Amino acid sequence: MSRIAVIGAGAWGTALAIVLGRRGGHAVRLWAYEQEVVASILARRTNDLFLPEASIPATVTVTDSLTDALNGAEIVLSVMPSHHVRRLFTQMLPHLSDDMVFVSATKGVEDQTYLRMTEVIEEVVTPRFSPRLVAVSGPTFAKEVAKGDPTAITAASSDEDLARTVQHEFSDPRFRVYTNRDVVGVELGGALKNVIAIAAGICDGLELGHNSVAALVTRGLAEITRLSLACGGHIETMAGLAGLGDLVLTCTGGLSRNRTVGVELGKGRKLADIIAGMRGMVAEGVLTTNAAIGLANKHGVEMPITQQMHAILHQGKSPSDAIRELMSRPSTTEVWL
């Protein structure tokens, strides 16, 4: 029996705990920061705050103690917001060991440092030991995963055996896991698509039609690909689950928090008011925009959509003005990387 610690009981962390718990053969411990989450799971086997529709199997134990969650764990699954990863791994460090496998399911890039999530974990843990790391990503809505709707993701690691281990431990008939060696592309695809999803939502909020969203998704994929390649990613990954797959889902699906932020911005609402109404949930694209611009500047990569999203989110630019500027850029060839 594999012992798995799931660190983070938001919607996505809870959904993954459900997948692992229903698979059988796992002892799953779900760590939650929020006392309300712990209480509701203990009382009703539901996460009333973040994923109230889903029933959590008895094979999943909930705790608010990191020590208890990590005790004896063979796999540590990190599903916390990107801005908490460094702090929590620093807090967990005394309880971590080199025989653990660390799996990151967080789709984000750290602000200021521009590090991907596995890089953050590696930087924190390496003074003690060299961590064994895997990143998982793909087109996933937590609600559908928890429900058992057919889903496919990618597990990426420079160590193929580690990727296959995660593939084996996470797969079931309703949750298919592929492997990939391109950690850079898988993580950047999962993080950067959130920025493009906000842009797609703005188009819907402004009622600009389907053509505009299709154009944004396509050109958004082009700039994500350019940055990923500049950082060492592989172009093939951008055509896969962690690239195109996740981008299409997040830009068009009604359950996308990042797209929803864009829709509300397009309707004229203020970002602070939108975030305040999200009940503690995180739209990673808002934070990732800063890091994406930093990475683009570092590598000399042109990312016009991302630049306009940064201006809207952090500089108060009008969404209508941003769209107008994107459409009036100098003409160029379509295919260039």
From Swiss-Prot:
Record pathway: Membrane lipid metabolism; glycerophospholipid metabolism
Active site: 193 (proton acceptor)
Listed Gene3D superfamilies: N-(1-d-carboxylethyl)-l-norvaline Dehydrogenase, domain 2 (1.10.1040.10), NAD(P)-binding Rossmann-like Domain (3.40.50.720)
Family: Belongs to the NAD-dependent glycerol-3-phosphate dehydrogenase family.
Keyword Ligase attributed: no
Keyword Protease: no
Name of protein: Glycerol-3-phosphate dehydrogenase [NAD(P)+]
Species for this entry: Koribacter versatilis (strain Ellin345)
Protein EC: 1.1.1.94
Gene Ontology CC annotations of this record: cytosol
Coiled-coil annotated residue ranges, if any: none
Role, per record: Catalyzes the reduction of the glycolytic intermediate dihydroxyacetone phosphate (DHAP) to sn-glycerol 3-phosphate (G3P), the key precursor for phospholipid synthesis.
Name of the coding gene: gpsA
GO BP terms in the entry: carbohydrate metabolic process; glycerol-3-phosphate biosynthetic process; glycerol-3-phosphate catabolic process; glycerophospholipid metabolic process; phospholipid biosynthetic process
